[in-house]
């Protein structure tokens, strides 16, 4: 039996981003979030109002995904969208930066982009797909973010292989255990979740949260 001595309702983040959800499906997800007392949600800008209305009497951190999944947001629009998220009640920003600036050697441009996201004062989590970055670029991303005071990192974007235990060890070695590390992508089973937590990961994000919590109930 896996060790489930974790606050799973706080450490498993519900991801609700499917643009094809029916209203009935969206409401059902909200009911499940309340049923399992899930305290952290990642969602798109378009769903912020709906969450605010459906979860009006429920306490949860709602993080808005910006520039996800294509990192195609021009820098000139960052402030407007981040402020929009803040005005709509987002408690944090999960941001996918433009990595090509680093491969061009434009470290200052990359840093300026991250600083622009931070201007709102909301907690910022930087999304990184380790498997798609050259090692030098990957290390540059981490170093710049840490220098700018970023303390929250998400590894995996749902497009690529699942993070391995070797990846986790490498990430922790670079980032350190004092920062918050969330893993996303391919997480469907309770055992995956527990293994990641046992290896030092802070939290996981998944759209399969209902199935995972159903496993917990069986145990």
PLM feature segments, named:
Residues 1-28, 169, 173-180, 188-219:
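Alpha/beta catalytic cores of nucleotide-metabolism and tRNA/nucleoside-modifying enzymes
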Residues 77-86, 92-154:
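Conserved anion-binding
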Residues 9-11, 39-42, 59-65, 91-94, ...:
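Structural preference for beta-strand elements that scaffold enzyme active sites
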Residues 18-20, 128-131, 158:
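Short beta->alpha junction loops
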Residues 15, 64-69, 88-102, 147-164, ...:
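Glycine-rich phosphate-binding active-site loops on the catalytic face of alpha/beta enzymes
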Residues 1-88, 135, 140, 144-146:
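Conserved N-terminal beta1-alpha1 strand-loop-helix module at the mouth
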Residues 45, 49-70, 107-132, 162-189:
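Alpha-helix-loop-beta-strand connector modules within alpha/beta enzyme cores
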Residues 73-87, 133-144, 166-168, 173-181, ...:
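Catalytic cores of alpha/beta
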């Amino acid at each position: 039996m896996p060790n489930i001595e974790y606050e799973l309702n706080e450490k498993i983040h519900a991801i609700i981003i499917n643009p094809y959800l029916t209203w009935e499906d969206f409401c059902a997800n909200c009911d499940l979030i309340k049923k399992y007392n899930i305290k952290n949600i990642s969602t798109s800008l378009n769903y912020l109002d709906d969450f605010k209305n459906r979860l009006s009497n429920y306490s949860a951190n709602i993080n808005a995904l910006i520039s996800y999944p294509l990192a195609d947001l021009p820098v000139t629009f960052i402030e407007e969208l981040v402020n929009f998220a803040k005005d709509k009640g987002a408690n944090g920003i999960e941001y996918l930066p433009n990595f090509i600036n680093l491969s061009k050697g434009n470290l200052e441009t990359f840093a300026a982009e991250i600083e622009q996201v931070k201007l709102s004062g909301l907690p910022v989590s930087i999304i990184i797909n380790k498997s798609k970055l050259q090692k030098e670029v990957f290390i540059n991303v981490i170093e710049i973010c840490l220098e700018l005071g970023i303390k929250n990192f998400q590894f995996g974007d749902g497009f690529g292989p699942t993070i391995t235990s070797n990846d986790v060890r490498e990430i922790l070695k670079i980032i350190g255990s004092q920062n918050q590390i969330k893993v996303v992508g391919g997480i469907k089973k309770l055992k995956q979740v527990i293994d990641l937590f046992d290896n030092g990961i802070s939290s996981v994000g998944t759209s399969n949260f209902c199935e995972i919590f159903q496993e917990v109930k069986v145990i």
